[in-house]
């Protein structure tokens, strides 16, 4: 999302279409973000500061080469034979073994027992 300025002297047309100045994109100034010990990093995209965490879509083939900790939000996905576990648990275990912080939501206890098994290095490929 980009914030833009409206053209000076122009009003918003009746049908809801607006006129804007595309060359005048509003960028957040550095003064918005503290640079002392209270603001070392932020968890929001589209800023120049190094992010601590960023909530994004992740899948097993996603390349994480920028040293950003990935948070797997609601990463639940029914039974895969070798582990006798649901695909949801396999997906959760996969993310945990990759070092991703997983925020799982479930009211079913068996769907969050992710520490009772481990994936092999071959499974992780």
Swiss-Prot record:
Keywords for the protein's UniProt record, in alphabetical order: Alkaloid metabolism, Cytoplasm, NAD, NADP, Oxidoreductase
Modifications the protein undergoes after translation, according to the UniProt entry: The N-terminus is blocked.
GO molecular function, a single term: aldo-keto reductase (NADPH) activity
Listed GO biological process terms: alkaloid metabolic process
Entry GO CC: cytoplasm
Documented EC number(s): 1.1.1.218
InterPro entries, per the entry: AKR, NADP_OxRdtase_dom_sf
Catalytic activity field: morphine + NAD(+) = morphinone + NADH + H(+); morphine + NADP(+) = morphinone + NADPH + H(+)
Main location: cytoplasm
Recorded superkingdom: Eukaryota
Enzyme superclass (EC): oxidoreductase
Compartments it resides in: Cytoplasm
Binding site for NADP(+): 9-18, 74-111
Regulation of catalytic or functional activity: Strongly inhibited by sulfhydryl reagents and quercetin, but not by pyrazole, barbital and indomethacine.
pH behavior: Optimum pH is 9.4 with NAD as the cofactor.
PANTHER family: 2,5-DIKETO-D-GLUCONIC ACID REDUCTASE, NADP-DEPENDENT OXIDOREDUCTASE DOMAIN-CONTAINING PROTEIN
Summary of subunit composition and partner proteins: Monomer.
Family per record: Belongs to the aldo/keto reductase family.
Functional note: Catalyzes the dehydrogenation of morphine to morphinone. Uses both NAD and NADP, but the activity is much greater with NAD than with NADP.
Name of the protein in its database record: Morphine 6-dehydrogenase
């Amino acid at each position: 999302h980009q914030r833009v300025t409206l053209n000076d002297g122009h009003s918003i047309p009746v049908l809801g279409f607006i006129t804007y100045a595309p060359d005048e994109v509003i960028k957040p100034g550095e003064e918005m973000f503290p640079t002392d010990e209270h603001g070392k990093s932020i968890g929001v995209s589209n800023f120049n500061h190094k992010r601590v965490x960023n909530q994004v879509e992740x899948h097993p083939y996603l390349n994480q080469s920028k040293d950003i900790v990935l948070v797997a939000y609601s990463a639940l996905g029914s039974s895969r034979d070798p582990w006798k576990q649901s695909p949801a648990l396999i997906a959760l275990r996969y993310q945990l073994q990759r070092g991703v912080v997983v925020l799982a939501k479930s009211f079913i206890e068996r769907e969050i027992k992710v520490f009772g098994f481990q994936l092999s290095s071959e499974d992780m490929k």
